[in-house]
């Protein structure tokens, strides 16, 4: 996949700033010319094709309640399904699993209609890493969002496709 890197692009696919299914060097060069005409910086990424589902994961710092994490259906479904849950940090794995089980997209993670179940161990590891990072950087990190976070079949891990970090401005 080839995508534009521009801090003003929140939804790259909506802006036509992502080209997928690149089949070789000639296609890559042509795709690069197309995107370079509009964007100065591009990123080449491996195309992950075996995702069980796409999640959105965000952590934010609230001055009153402290750090919290949002988890939900991601990618194209993030806004369409309005399927997300919020939890205060830190959070034990049992509570994270319960939260994930309450999502509409959870059947996909379990292996819906004979499909492979998701790598829940890797998903929980990444969520806990994000929680720890958020707590360690609570003085400077305002927000971090990954969308989509591709959850792959058991034993294959997860893959963050796109992420946005916002740090507090120095005063």
Regions found by a protein language model. Name each.
Residues 1-171:
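ATP-dependent carboxylate/acyl-activation modules
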